[in-house]
A protein has these predicted regions:
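Conserved S/T- and glycine-rich ATP-binding loop of Class I adenylate-forming
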Residues: 6-9, 42, 89, 155, ...
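Active-site loops of AMP-binding adenylate-forming
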Residues: 20, 147, 153-161, 168-186, ...
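Conserved AMP-binding/adenylation subdomain of ANL enzymes
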Residues: 24-41, 48-128, 136, 161
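Adenylate-forming
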Residues: 26-30, 98-103, 140-141, 149-153, ...
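Active-site glycine-centered loops adjacent to acidic/histidine catalytic or metal-binding residues
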Residues: 47, 144, 167, 189, ...
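Conserved ATP/PPi-binding loop(s) of AMP-dependent carboxylate-activating enzymes
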Residues: 187-194, 203-231, 251, 266-270
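AMP-binding/adenylate-forming catalytic core of the ANL superfamily
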Residues: 214, 219-220, 243-311
Length: 311
């Protein structure tokens, strides 16, 4: 069992009390959902105090009888991948986006790569790229924040599927993961099969607060019954604070944080995270935050953005 502290992005850090049963139920459901194998070699890049890394990158491969490999440092990732030949790599969006940007930069500089692609031999270029990752990498799992769809599609073209999942520390942490067979870019897959879920107060687009209940939900916050009562209701549902919607195949799309929701003067719900993802694609933007603001006595909010330019 563990007490893992949340990042504190929504308030003061709180210790989520997670039992052995929480972790093992999450591991078992994740294996069924994604389709991991005993022959898989997981490359561990993220720190183990991160619940995503601890469960999916450490406990999961050990429970399978698979292999768990560790990089020496961020600077030696490429070299270590060639040596360790992983089949699975778990990462956060920033790392995946930097790796893909570096691939793109190297391809632009390489005359051989440009010539091969011009000759219709892009598959050969992609095979050489995969060889740099050890030649056995069959999927990259992403969690922690939204990922640029261009990065997801770019890795797919290379022949390395990137599966974007969703979770939070309070759920040990996985809530929804895609499968290789049915992944839809822009979604985080389906809710794990041992969790019950509901969308609270959905709007006209179907987006509502995601609430989940099941064996991987924490006992509560350590020595903080008040904070526990704020997120776990009388029926045992954990209120995630995240807005989500479902498609016809039950794939989940995360729209943003409930507290960040902007309601404009026409009463329309606007999800700032979706706008931020579009603005961040501009090469001249280093960082951006989209927020709502009011002018005078207006009802509703206008939408604004604070942008940090890329030097």
């Amino acid at each position: 069992a563990s007490i893992l502290y949340t990042s504190g992005t929504t308030g003061k850090p709180k210790g989520a009390m997670l039992t052995h049963g929480n972790f093992t139920s999450n591991v078992e459901a994740s294996i069924r959902q994604v389709g991991f194998h005993p022959s898989d070699n997981f490359l561990n890049i993220l720190p183990l105090f991160h619940s995503f890394s601890f469960t999916a990158n450490f406990m999961l491969p050990l429970s399978l009888g698979g292999c768990c490999s560790f990089v020496r440092s961020i600077k030696t990732i490429t070299e270590d991948m060639r040596l360790l030949q992983p089949t699975v790599m778990l990462a956060v969006p920033l790392l995946a986006e930097k790796i893909y940007a570096r691939i793109q930069e190297q391809m632009k500089k390489s005359m051989a790569a440009r010539a091969l692609r011009a000759a219709g031999l892009g598959a050969l270029v992609h095979r050489r790229i995969r060889a740099r990752f050890g030649g056995r990498l069959r999927l990259i799992g992403i969690g922690g924040a939204p990922t640029d769809p261009a990065t997801l599609r770019g890795f797919q073209r290379i022949g390395i599927p990137v599966l974007e999942g969703y979770g939070l520390t309070e759920c040990s942490p996985g809530v929804a993961y895609p499968s290789l067979a049915s992944y839809v870019v822009g979604t985080v897959g389906q809710v794990l099969d041992n969790l019950e879920y509901k969308l609270l107060e959905p709007d006209a687009t179907g987006a509502g607060e995601l609430c989940v209940r099941g064996p991987s939900v924490m006992l509560g916050y350590y020595k903080n019954p008040g904070a526990t009562a704020e997120v776990i209701d009388a029926d045992g549902y954990l209120h995630t604070g995240d807005l989500a919607r479902l498609d016809d195949r039950k794939n989940l799309t995360i729209c943003g944080r409930r507290k960040a929701l902007i309601v404009n003067r026409e009463g329309k719900n606007i999800y700032p995270e979706e706008i931020e993802q579009v603005i961040e694609r501009c090469p001249f933007v280093k960082d951006v935050i989209v927020l709502g603001y009011q002018v005078g006595g207006e009802t509703g909010e206008r939408v604004g953005a604070i942008i940090v330019p890329d030097d």
